[in-house]
């Protein structure tokens, strides 16, 4: 199995943080369980300097995982490198043989371009959120992957969080009644736009980068259709720092269920939390129904750590946590699961020579869930949140007017 990972930043390797990211630890855990005889991960970064920093992270993660590389063929390679300082992911796509799949973790504004090129080379592709920024681009990608009979997924890992699965179970059981509203508060530390994403933060906004998770989640829980959107944003602190993007955005989405019941979702998102906040992300969701409500504080998960060396910490043990098992490190959580289920699905497909099968003899949904987890997000489903983002961005540019979703 040969995996191409395009992008080598914080989420892939933990570069710029004291962690090892989420994507590569997920790949480690996938191989630890499956012990595939020939297993290779190719990392494609933007420049030689970044790839060198990420390479150190990758090699250290492998070392502390204590995977016996003499028994498991686990090869990693990095581009650009000393011999090929100008080589990019485009060269790898063109020249590398027998790639199994691609994982795309690049800045938001590059998603369409990179995903499109992966599909051009017939690769099952997993992309981090958001899927795309424009609906027309989402439609093009969906059409292409269907024509080529390959799979495309977007890594909306909040669908795998047991907090949110409990919300879905409560909603589906109808014990909370008909939906009236969802209220979401979601924020991250200033270090994210100011340092970690400084080179491209001005090309996105906090709703696209972060809030989209909970737009997708409301669709996942209710299967409702977004009808119209209103968004208001504030530019202050980041603009003074030379980063021309919104500090905070408030967004109202009107949804309609299959039973023609309308409800609203209100999101308040920002990425200017103090850097000494007790967690990287502060996140809460509340559902109000005609028979009851559901509240989930997804930052305060019952753990606080205080030491002389650090401020108070409230870690999230459910997302992606490194645990010591004897002398080795293992990573567990719904963030890990969201990626390993994609790799498991690709392996099933490859073992069954899926591309040459009668793809359209069954419904696309049945075929999708034969290989992937029920919580997985197809390109088709991810296009729902893209439509909301596009309308929200139009609202921001037009005096925060309501924008209908087409």
Listing of model-derived features with the role each one plays in the protein:
Residues 9, 153, 158-244, 251, ...:
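Predominantly a Rossmann-like dinucleotide-binding segment in NAD(P)-dependent oxidoreductases
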Residues 209-310, 325-352, 364-369, 389-393, ...:
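Contiguous beta-strand/loop segments that form the cofactor/metal-binding neighborhood of enzyme cores
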Residues 1-121:
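N-terminal glycine-/serine-/threonine-rich beta1-alpha1-beta2 phosphate-ribose binding loop
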Residues 352-384, 404:
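Glycine- and charged-residue-rich phosphate/anionic-cofactor binding loop of Rossmann-like
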Residues 49-54, 329-340, 357-360, 380-384:
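Active-site loop of classical SDR/Rossmann-like NAD(P)-dependent oxidoreductases
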Residues 101, 107-159:
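Beta-strand-loop-alpha-helix segment that lines the small-molecule cofactor/substrate pocket
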Residues 123, 150-151, 178-180, 261-265:
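Short, well-ordered coil/turn segments that N-cap beta-strands
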Residues 22-32, 55-60, 165-171, 251-254, ...:
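Short, well-ordered amphipathic alpha-helices
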